[in-house]
């Protein structure tokens, strides 16, 4: 049985490079998964940046043509254009300061899933602001060389307003 030794190093770009002696296939797999997680984190960060800037096109560009959006207290929204119409309303109400904290990202072939928490500020009709926090689950699908949201679900940790 061949011995495998692991070695990690950080490149100038900050990417962790792992080598597993005796297992080039394992090395390629680890490298691809690290790259996938970093790519998905960046897309998520860009999504939040576009959201906070009120840039609907940038938000919607992250979704696959046949994506499903699963917001709390609402029926499922199917398709990129339907998601665009649905998101136009809250985006127009200045929901802001949206930030995600990724708990983990896993990948299996052309599918990846991203689990974490979010927080955001929601302006109220009386001029006050309401803080919200909750969790999300996003399913990503690789289309060519791009990762796109195939399913996006979230729910607040706070009780619904009366």
Sequence positions of predicted segments:
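Short beta-strand edge/turn micro-motifs at domain boundaries
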Residues: 133-160
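A short, structured loop/turn motif at beta-sheet edges
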Residues: 105-112, 141-146
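Histidine kinase transmitter module recognition
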Residues: 50-51, 90, 139
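Polar/charged side chains located within well-ordered beta-strands of beta-rich proteins
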Residues: 44, 63, 114, 138-140, ...
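Short, low-complexity N-terminal intrinsically disordered segments enriched in polar/charged residues
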Residues: 2-65, 81, 160-162
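A short, polar/proline- and glycine-enriched secondary-structure boundary/capping micro-motif
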Residues: 125-127, 159-162
């Amino acid at each position: 049985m061949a011995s495998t030794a692991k070695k990690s190093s950080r490149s100038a770009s900050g990417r962790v490079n792992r080598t597993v002696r005796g297992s080039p296939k394992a090395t390629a797999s680890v490298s691809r998964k690290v790259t996938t997680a970093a790519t998905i984190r960046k897309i998520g960060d860009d999504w939040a940046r576009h959201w906070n800037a009120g840039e609907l096109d940038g938000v919607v560009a992250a979704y696959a043509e046949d994506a499903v959006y699963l917001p709390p207290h609402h029926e499922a929204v199917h398709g990129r254009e339907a998601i665009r119409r649905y998101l136009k309303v809250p985006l127009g109400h200045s929901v802001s300061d949206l930030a995600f904290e990724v708990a983990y990202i896993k990948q299996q072939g052309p599918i990846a899933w991203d689990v974490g928490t979010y927080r955001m500020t929601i302006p109220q009709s009386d001029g006050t602001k309401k803080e919200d926090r909750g969790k999300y689950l996003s399913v990503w699908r690789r289309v060519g060389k791009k990762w796109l949201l195939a399913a996006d679900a979230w729910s607040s940790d706070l009780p619904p307003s009366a």
